């Protein structure tokens, strides 16, 4: 199955903060880069400063690291 923009996907990269979480495909790069799929999540990761709203809620993945949710 081809991943398309707006699709809900589950992350299968074990070292990822979002492993087994569901996110939405924000964009897909077709230029041949290693991690072409940008996935957006509802929650942010741990890189935000303590006591300050922030953090990252997107990450790039390869299509092989994603499965439809």
UniProtKB/Swiss-Prot annotation:
One of its GO terms (cellular component) is plasma membrane-derived thylakoid membrane. The keyword Membrane applies. It is a peripheral membrane protein. The keyword Coiled coil does not apply. Keywords: Membrane, Photosynthesis, Photosystem I, Thylakoid. It is found in: Cellular thylakoid membrane. It holds the Pfam family PSI_PsaE. HAMAP family: PSI_PsaE. This is Photosystem I reaction center subunit IV. It comes from Synechococcus sp. (strain CC9605).
């Amino acid at each position: 199955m081809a991943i398309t923009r707006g699709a809900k996907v589950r992350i299968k990269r074990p070292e990822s903060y979002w492993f087994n979480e569901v996110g939405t495909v924000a964009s897909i790069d077709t230029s041949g880069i290693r991690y072409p799929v940008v996935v957006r999540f509802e929650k942010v990761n741990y890189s935000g400063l303590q006591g300050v709203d922030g953090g990252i809620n997107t990450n790039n993945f390869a299509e092989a690291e994603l499965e439809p949710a």
